[in-house]
Amino acid sequence: MTTTQIKNRGFTLVELLIVIVIIAILTVVSLVAYNGLQNQAKTSTAKSTADSVAKKAELYNTEKGHYPEGLTIFTSNTDDSTTPPSDNKKNSWYMSGESVKSATLTDGSVPADGPLAIEYVKCPGSSTSPTGAQIYYYDFSSNKKVARVVGTGC
């Protein structure tokens, strides 16, 4: 009679190393994909913020007949006379200072305020009556600022 000995064998060192390398590759791929999704989400938020500012600028133009001089008019809730309205009657163009931040954007330099950072540049016109504006937001995927134009003259 022959008996076969059954030996309990574990994994070899090579097999364990192969599994570790596969796990490392999957981790790197998932991190890169996650960062890409994060940048897309930030860009989407920045574009939405710029669209909100553009709509508020259009409202301001409808009510006042010209575009605002700068972004601070939206967040200070004042009109051209710098008199704030009563608490129960806010200007239609008002935006919370927490929802938008004024910034000077440059390509390749991520803004400190993230996707809430907006650069508002009035178009040429008379000094008291701008005919439009360029509203810039930061594209986190391409690391560039992107312009959205409202009105004319830019």
PLM features: residue spans?
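Membrane-proximal amphipathic alpha-helices
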Residues: 38-50
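Short amphipathic beta-strand and strand-loop transition segments with alternating hydrophobic
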Residues: 110-127
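Short, surface-exposed interaction loops/tails
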Residues: 122-154
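Alpha-helix exit/C-cap motif
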Residues: 55-73
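Acidic, glycine-rich loop-and-strand cores that form catalytic or ligand-binding grooves
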Residues: 70-113
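N-terminal signal-anchor/signal peptide hydrophobic helix marking the start
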Residues: 11-21
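N-terminal leader/signal peptides at the extreme start of proteins
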Residues: 1-11
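C-terminal juxtamembrane segment of a hydrophobic transmembrane alpha-helix
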Residues: 23-41
